[in-house]
Amino acid sequence: MVVQAAIPLLVEIGPSVTTLQIARAAGISEPTIFRAFTDKNELLTACLAHVSDPGHVVQALEAIEPTMPLPERLVAVIETIRAQGERTGAVANAVRLAGAARPRTHESMSEEERDRLSESRNSSYASLHAAVAAVFEPDADALRLPVEDVATLVLAIVMALGRGGSWDTGIASITTDGLADLILHGITTHHPPSAAPSPGD
């Protein structure tokens, strides 16, 4: 309950959020927080672990109504992954700025730790990929590519955009609806123009 209440505040306020603000959002007294957590840093670290759990976004993807039209389901997939990525990034940045957790570099890890990290990331991606593919499964016959390939492409595009921060503001902005339309229909008309004549024709 405390962690769930703290995450939106971390996204909105950042590392300056106080335990009193978190307690009020959770509907408890401030001292109650410290019965579960040693200090604010431990709470922030727990928030990062919670928001990084891929199970939350997988559940959200599984909740997308399969009878919705394909364009609406695609928008829902993009919004779900995008929101999760932005939320995770905001919390991770707040935790980093607060000094609650120092990220380990790849070089500082043992081989066993690197293997565990790689396995965890692969497992997380596999569960996310399966959930996205399942959303498109009802329209498998209408797609040009297998649903697994569609899921791979959608994830690659949305995750790549997410690495640059918010992608719906600024001069190079793109809306979720615009991205969904691009994925569904590409950049050409249904009847592409004929090839330009070669010199000498």
Model-flagged regions — what are they?
Residues 1, 5, 9-42, 46:
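Helix-turn-helix
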Residues 18, 56, 60, 90-96, ...:
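Short, hydrophobic secondary-structure boundary micro-motifs
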Residues 42-43, 49-53, 83, 101, ...:
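Residue-level marker of structural boundaries
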Residues 76, 83, 126, 130-147, ...:
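C-terminal peripheral helix-coil segments that are non-catalytic and often amphipathic
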